């Protein structure tokens, strides 16, 4: 998918830039950032991030600045309308998900409920 198409999940410039830097450190240009949702955390669901060099059937791939964000169909249904960003601050540096579908989130923001 390209930057010109309305996407169900936004991949910010800051996140794409950080992914590009991390991938260059790994010397594997096939790596993509995978965002996923699993059961757990104090609010019921939690976000996860990993680098993956494959795209599975049904996965959505969002490309920006020469790197890709990959989301499986199950996770995507909970993330529609959200964004994946990267931030650096007093709490450290991390990828964050802004999710308009989350009814409540825990204090650290890493888990949520629908």
Swiss-Prot record:
Residues bound to iron-sulfur cluster are 42, 106, 108
Q: List required co-factors.
A: iron-sulfur cluster
Taken from the UniProt entry, a GO cellular component term is: cytosol
Spell out the InterPro entries in the cross-references: FeS_biogenesis, FeS_cluster_insertion, FeS_cluster_insertion_CS, FeS_cluster_insertion_RrpA, HesB-like_dom_sf
Cofactor binding notes: Binds 1 iron-sulfur cluster per subunit.
Keyword match Iron: yes
What keyword terms does UniProt attach to this protein? Iron, Iron-sulfur, Metal-binding
Which GO BP terms sit in this record? iron-sulfur cluster assembly
Molecular function via GO: 2 iron, 2 sulfur cluster binding; 4 iron, 4 sulfur cluster binding; iron ion binding
Keyword Phosphoprotein attributed: no
The cross-references to NCBIfam families, in alphabetical order and at most eight, read:
iron-sulfur cluster assembly accessory protein, PRK13623.1
User: Quaternary state and partners of this protein?
Assistant: Homodimer.
Q: PANTHER family from the entry?
A: IRON-SULFUR CLUSTER ASSEMBLY 2 HOMOLOG, MITOCHONDRIAL
Function comment: Required for insertion of 4Fe-4S clusters for at least IspG.
Q: Which family does it belong to?
A: Belongs to the HesB/IscA family.
Protein name listed in UniProt: Iron-sulfur cluster insertion protein ErpA
Q: Which gene encodes it?
A: erpA
């Amino acid at each position: 998918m390209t930057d010109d198409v309305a996407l169900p999940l936004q991949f910010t410039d800051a996140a794409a830039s950080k992914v590009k830097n991390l991938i260059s450190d790994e010397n594997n240009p096939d790596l993509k950032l995978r965002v996923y949702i699993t059961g757990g955390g104090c609010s019921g669901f939690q976000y996860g991030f990993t680098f993956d060099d494959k795209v599975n059937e049904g996965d959505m791939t969002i490309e920006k600045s020469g790197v890709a964000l990959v989301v499986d169909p199950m996770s995507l249904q909970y993330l529609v309308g959200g964004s994946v960003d990267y931030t650096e601050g007093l709490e450290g540096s991390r990828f964050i998900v802004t999710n308009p579908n989350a009814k409540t989130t825990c204090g650290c923001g890493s888990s949520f409920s629908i």
